[in-house]
Amino acid sequence: MRTALKRKKREVHRHQGNTGAMLFTLLLAILCGLAVYILSDISFMRPSREISLLIAESAKKEEISPALLEAVILTESKFDKKAVSHVGAIGMMQLMPDTAEWISEESGLPANRLERPEENIPLGAWYINYLLKEYHNNEILALAAYNAGRGNVDQWMKDYGWKEGFSDMNQIPFPETREFVKSVTASRDRLEAEQAEK
């Protein structure tokens, strides 16, 4: 009887040991998943050296801030050249094919393969420059137009009486566009601060 009781206790302890190991494994898996999620956050993303050079060259050519250009790419695609949105925007800068075609006609830049960063980034940089000129260097309006389209931004300016100096991102009616502008400007500020520290 005593031997059977001891055996039973050992089995209980063994079972508890297995439960502890299972809980530890589960906790470890959750922590690993959380670490992957945190590290995949856009604030930790960095472009490859090749993409960094392409960003610098395109920004210089179009006379725009490299930090702004990188921040748009970061927000749009997290540097994924194969990114395709649910509405059909393609590549790192998430250009719609018809917009890319128009940019190509206006700029003379190729727009044959939008998944190629060497085509996509120069087209997007040209477009940002164009929008900044259209909106008198107002980055908020230019970024809103990049995301929601010029027609929408022009209509908002008319409907809400926005002027060239518009600065209240919270007034942007489309939630997606509002968050896009906030994300790009925050990333741009962070990138500029990092650059200043170097």
For every predicted segment, state its role:
Residues 21-39:
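Hydrophobic membrane-insertion alpha-helices, especially the h-region
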Residues 1-18:
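N-terminal Lys/Arg-rich, disordered targeting/topogenic segments
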Residues 10-14, 28-33, 48-52:
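Short juxtamembrane and helix-loop transition motifs at transmembrane-helix boundaries
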Residues 37-198:
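Catalytic glycan-binding domains that act on GlcNAc-containing polysaccharides
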Residues 15-19, 23, 139:
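Structural motif marking the loop-to-transmembrane transition
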